[in-house]
Each structure stands twice: as structure tokens, then as C-alpha cells.
């Protein structure tokens, strides 16, 4: 896979104008040293950058459909190779949000991607894993993307992310909301899909991703419901995209997860402290008294639910303690490779 992608990369780079050629060298650490937080940013990129794109060592557990064809059409292979080039050199890599890709060692049409969710959201710094498959009809049809971080099929992290792993996105043809960008065989790419997941799904107020709920924006009731939804999402994120990732990382992203959280430790704990403080403030807030429509009805004051925020504060506090223990524990040794199967006994004479 990497050999085919490398050939496509060299051809594309040679054909591109000098100003638009893909830069293949890593940016030198410290090149942006004048920027705030540049040291932490440079250290993160130096540690996680070399791990952004690679073949999976063992893809035996991947669920794979039948191969696209015994001998895929050359145009299909060329387009897949170009997709690999784009992903291998253009995935986002920042403290605020990053992505990593692993390729099936013998199938160009199968990838696995890990995304660290953006800061400023209830998903911040959590690691979410997705399977990507390119159908035989690609690029006429979009790739299929399935989320694997689902709390073992129990958690819906977003109106666009289902417990079964379904990802609803207009680019994928799985969502038909207004204003969504649809798949274009000539111009749409997997990289575009991944960036859309980061920007359009992992958002600060996921409650409003539900069609029709945007009408509640800016109202006391809408703000209250959005805050409760985000609070519940944050609990799920800490439990499944942080704690469970540290305890049971996907084998192909084990080192990514370890290094990511080693570099993001202080941010993650501070972000949780801020969320706990916010829950404490909401729990202690007096019930608003206002004339007009009943409480909890559109146009009226927000419901007063100190018990929800009390429970949320207690849950986050417990999760934070569990997470800090994992973050401060010495790294666990990588599991030993499985022993080869013993040879079959010789047939009797």
C-alpha cells in the first residue's frame, strides 16, 4: 500500500507547480517558536507526527468485506493511491486536534483512523476510532465510515453518531439535512470527510446537530438543554474516549494513545476541573423567576434542575480521579506477540 501511494505521491509532486507541491519533509521542531505554546506544540508534533500514517502491524481483527475485485480497475487503484497520498501528508496534527491513519497491510480499500477531538468541545482531547472502507464503485460512491468508539454499542455521542457506529454526514450520503455538501466523484476526498467529522460533528454544542433543534438557539430553554446534552457527552467522552482508550487501546493506535495523553495530561485535567466548576455553579444557581410561559417551555425560563448538575459533578469528579490514576501510572508493557502455532503432527507411517 505504501509503495503504491509513494509512487502516486512522486508523480503528483512532479506534475504540480512548485508553489503547490506537497511538502514531504517534516517541519523542523521549534520553527514557530515565537508563537504562544510553541514548545508544547513542537514537542507534540515531534512525538506524534511520525505516527500519523503507517501500515497496521496486525489487521486480523478488522471486519472486511470481500475484495473490491480480483483485479481492480487501474483507475480505481490510481484514485485509491491518491487518497493515500492525501491522507499521509495532510492529516491535521496539532495539540488542539489531530488524526492518525493505519492501512490494512494487503488491502488498499481498508483504513482505520483515530481522531483526537477539538478543544472547546465536550469531546476535547478524546480519541475516537473509525473504520473506513472504499466500495468497488468508488469514487462514484463515497467511502463508508463506521465509528468504533461507541461504548461497546451503548453510547450515542452525537445526533450524527449512532450506537451502531453509523456516521451521518452529507458527504457520505448518510444525512440529508439542509445545506450539507454532497459527495462529488471528481473533487471530494476522504481527507475532506475526516476534516468534516472534526469540524461539523465534534462541535461545542452537539445538541443543535439534531435537525430542527437549531430553532432553540439563544433561548433559555435551548441553552439549558444544550448544556445538559453536552454534559452527558462529556461524561461519555471521559469514560470511553479517554479512560477506555488508555486501558484498552486499539492495537494499531496503542503508541498514539499513550503519547497523545502523555502530552495532553495537564490540559485534560484542567478542562475537567473547569467542567466540574461549571457544574458546581449550575447546581448552586437559584431558580430563575420570570413571568410569561411556563418553565421549560419555548419562550419561558429554563428548567431548574440542581439534582442533574449535582449528579454530573459527582460523576465527573469520580471519572477525573480514575483518569488521573491512569495518566500518572507508568506505561504498561506492550503485549507479547502471540506464539506461533505448533507444527502439525506427522502422519503415521
Short names for language-model regions:
Residues 1-125, 137-349:
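UBC/E2-like fold recognition across ubiquitin and ubiquitin-like conjugation systems
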Amino acid at each position: 500500500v505504501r509503495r503504491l501511494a509513494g509512487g502516486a505521491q512522486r508523480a503528483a509532486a512532479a506534475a504540480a507547480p512548485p508553489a503547490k507541491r506537497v511538502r514531504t519533509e517534516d517541519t523542523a521542531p521549534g520553527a514557530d517558536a515565537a508563537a504562544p505554546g510553541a514548545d508544547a506544540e513542537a514537542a507534540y508534533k515531534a512525538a506524534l507526527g511520525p505516527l500519523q500514517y503507517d501500515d497496521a502491524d496486525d489487521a486480523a481483527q478488522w471486519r472486511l468485506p470481500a475484495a473490491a475485485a480480483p483485479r481492480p480497475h487501474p483507475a480505481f487503484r490510481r484514485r485509491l493511491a491518491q487518497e493515500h497520498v492525501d491522507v499521509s501528508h495532510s492529516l491535521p496534527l496539532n495539540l488542539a486536534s489531530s488524526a492518525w491513519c493505519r492501512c490494512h497491510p494487503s488491502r488498499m480499500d481498508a483504513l482505520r483512523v483515530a481522531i483526537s477531538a477539538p478543544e472547546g468541545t465536550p469531546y476535547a482531547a478524546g480519541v475516537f476510532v473509525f473504520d473506513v472502507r472504499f466500495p468497488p464503485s468508488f469514487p462514484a460512491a463515497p467511502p463508508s465510515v463506521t465509528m468504533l468508539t461507541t461504548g461497546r454499542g451503548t453510547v450515542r455521542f452525537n445526533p450524527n453518531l449512532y450506537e451502531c457506529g453509523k456516521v451521518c454526514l452529507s458527504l457520505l450520503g448518510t444525512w440529508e439535512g439542509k445545506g450539507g455538501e454532497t459527495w462529488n466523484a471528481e473533487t471530494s476526498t476522504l481527507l475532506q470527510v475526516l476534516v468534516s467529522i472534526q469540524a461539523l460533528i465534534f462541535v461545542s454544542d452537539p445538541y443543535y446537530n439534531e435537525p430542527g433543534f437549531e430553532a432553540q438557539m439563544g433561548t433559555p430553554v435551548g441553552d439549558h438543554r444544550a448544556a445538559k446534552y453536552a454534559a452527558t457527552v462529556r461524561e461519555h467522552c471521559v469514560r470511553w474516549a479517554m479512560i477506555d482508550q488508555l486501558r484498552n487501546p486499539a492495537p494499531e493506535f496503542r503508541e498514539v494513545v499513550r503519547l497523545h495523553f502523555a502530552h495532553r495530561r495537564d490540559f485534560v485535567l484542567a478542562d475537567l476541573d473547569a467542567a466540574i466548576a461549571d457544574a458546581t455553579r449550575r447546581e448552586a444557581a437559584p431558580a430563575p423567576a420570570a413571568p410569561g410561559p411556563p418553565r421549560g417551555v419555548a419562550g419561558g425560563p429554563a428548567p431548574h434542575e440542581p439534582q442533574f448538575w449535582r449528579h454530573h459533578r459527582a460523576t465527573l469528579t469520580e471519572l477525573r480521579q480514575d483518569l488521573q490514576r491512569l495518566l500518572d501510572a507508568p506505561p504498561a508493557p506492550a503485549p507479547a506477540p502471540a506464539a506461533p502455532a505448533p507444527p502439525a503432527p506427522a502422519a503415521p507411517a
